[in-house]
Amino acid sequence: MLECRVTKTKISIVRYLNAAPLAWGILEGQQSGDFQPVMSTPSECADQLANGSVDIGLIPSIEFQRIKGSKIIGGPVVSSRHRVRSVLLISNKPLWEVKTVACDSGSRTSVAL
């Protein structure tokens, strides 16, 4: 008797609100049963795609250039026509007095900006 295993495509999904419409389509859409979702931060999604622990990843555009052999799958994206204020610099002192800035390691795009 032959044993046939069907493996699901592992996909790393950003667990942030701005990616919710894409995540919903993957998790609840017509092909939802085809995927094994992994909920992650944007930087974790990129790392998982780069190290091969997932097959597909919703990654920040800035990460695409550093992942060798990656290809863009056409379709919907997370974008905006206007300012979204996702990166804020907040300080208790004037900007010229700021010597260091703490950044969220979960989003390398925010750090790059």
What are these regions, as identified by a protein language model?
Residues 2-113:
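Domain-level signature for soluble enzymes in the chorismate/prephenate branch of the shikimate pathway
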